[in-house]
């Protein structure tokens, strides 16, 4: 898998694994990566099979395996799960939620998350039998109850791709400790402004 690893201090700082969304590539996330560089944190950003220069065809099972491989790669570098933060963006929230279940990660961040792929598809194609036709389910609403790690859910209230109510519902279903950031004017690709960065920094500090 193609990925970028930015190391600051493996001993004293937590490490983020960033799971990106469906659209674009690693290069499209440079604006987020640059903000991570200003924070006392290590980070690994990976591209899925079938994305960027990676070979293969993306599937729910395949992306879970890619996520697991990323965690194992960090484990081999001596980074334990309790020092890893899973950060999922859009589609990547399905992978982060799945992997965080019944595990002891330092924290979980979900940006523009969906309740399930079926719900997300019904929002776009309300008159089709999506639950029958859709192969990949990504049932975040069922899995989030199994997450014991501290969780931060961020969702723009004007999201036109994944409706805001999905992020709000996941927040309601999540176990404590849980935190939210719901800016009123943000769309699907959230603006990495001062308020969002402060929210991330506060969350990171709460994990220490």
Question: Each predicted region: which residue ranges?
Answer:
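Mobile cap/lid helix-loop segments that gate and shape the active-site cleft of serine hydrolases
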Residues: 106, 113-149
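Acidic catalytic loop of the alpha/beta-hydrolase fold
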Residues: 157-162, 188-190
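Membrane-embedded segments
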Residues: 1-73, 82, 100
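Short alpha-helix in the alpha/beta-hydrolase fold that links the catalytic acid
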Residues: 32, 140, 149, 163-172
